């Protein structure tokens, strides 16, 4: 067992009831480009085409062979592009009568005998290959490549997250089958990183469990990788979340793409926080209709720490997101608020009286409580960073664009979500995730 001592569990109100409900039906789904850094799609469909679930929509020309398939059957209604024609979203109006693409089916006892090439090809053909991400760089793996190890994130310590154990218990056979299939993709270990609760266990020799406890970010893939088998420029690892492992198990058992998602619909802006059963890429404005409290609310695909604002062309559940978080827009001005004791406010530095209050959960809003300013190294980053790195020095190098020093300080191990807590506690209001991505892109291109 690895116990994480540094970190932070944010006392945010609106925690979900850990019971799974059926979500309202959604009529539109989409694939979003922002989740795949450097994506350059070669389109295989156009607006007005009818597509089956699992049908190829586009291929990544920067990573040939990586196919993105339709998460549902229906009509392609929109293809959005942004500045310099950067791909943003492909939207499908659902029509279940069109049907689905069929893939090869296997019996459970056949899975351990499948070759690496068979497993890879089925994942590529179905689009499930995109569920895998590399460290470093957090990109889809190159087809034919072999990782040193694969990490399965079977826990979630994000604020307002769903219980991974509860969801895995719904599909134990598919989860174990998914682990068996992942074990065929590497000569190293498949690490199932989990909390203290028991999970369905795989008997494949190279599948091992690792137990992590402690505050957030104890449940992040970056934390698991750092304390188990760190990544580097010469050592590539893959990671995947537990619901995608279940989806892989279903794909090989049924021969059909499985895009069900159980997500946490929660936060201070939700009237009845709970777990809901929906689908990958679901339209969030449709999913949250009549589910929110009065007032202006911000819908976030993902965690309140590292998720994306769901609005306009981005109004859809992200490929890797297992949460829909809702926060009130913090536009109200408080008269003389800067000198108030702040009994209803949270502060890592205990600048407010909130830490003396009996209120255990606080209503957080989107307000940053101040404009951007210079980095102030007062020890905040060190309080919440459990990884064996020097956070203040690393963040300074990211802000300065010093890629050589950032590499020496461990930036190749990290993803945007690993620095989300640093952004939250930063007195200077700096967003470190985009700075890290800019640095990683430069390193990948220039070394």
UniProtKB/Swiss-Prot annotation:
Pfam families, sorted: NQRA_2nd, NQRA_N, NQRA_SLBB
Q: Which InterPro entries match?
A: NqrA, NQRA_2nd, NqrA_C_domain, NQRA_N, Single_hybrid_motif
Known catalytic reactions = a ubiquinone + n Na(+)(in) + NADH + H(+) = a ubiquinol + n Na(+)(out) + NAD(+)
The keyword Transport is assigned to this record = yes
Keyword entries, A-Z: Ion transport, NAD, Sodium, Sodium transport, Translocase, Transport, Ubiquinone
Any single GO molecular-function term of the entry would be: oxidoreductase activity, acting on NAD(P)H, quinone or similar compound as acceptor
Give, as one word, the top-level EC class: translocase
Q: Which GO terms describe its biological process?
A: sodium ion transport
The EC number(s) given in the record are 7.2.1.1
The subunit structure is: Composed of six subunits; NqrA, NqrB, NqrC, NqrD, NqrE and NqrF.
State the similarity comment. Answer: Belongs to the NqrA family.
Q: Which NCBIfam families match?
A: nqrA, PRK05352.1-2
Q: What does this protein do?
A: NQR complex catalyzes the reduction of ubiquinone-1 to ubiquinol by two successive reactions, coupled with the transport of Na(+) ions from the cytoplasm to the periplasm. NqrA to NqrE are probably involved in the second step, the conversion of ubisemiquinone to ubiquinol.
Q: What name does UniProt use for this protein?
A: Na(+)-translocating NADH-quinone reductase subunit A
Protein's organism: Tolumonas auensis (strain DSM 9187 / NBRC 110442 / TA 4)
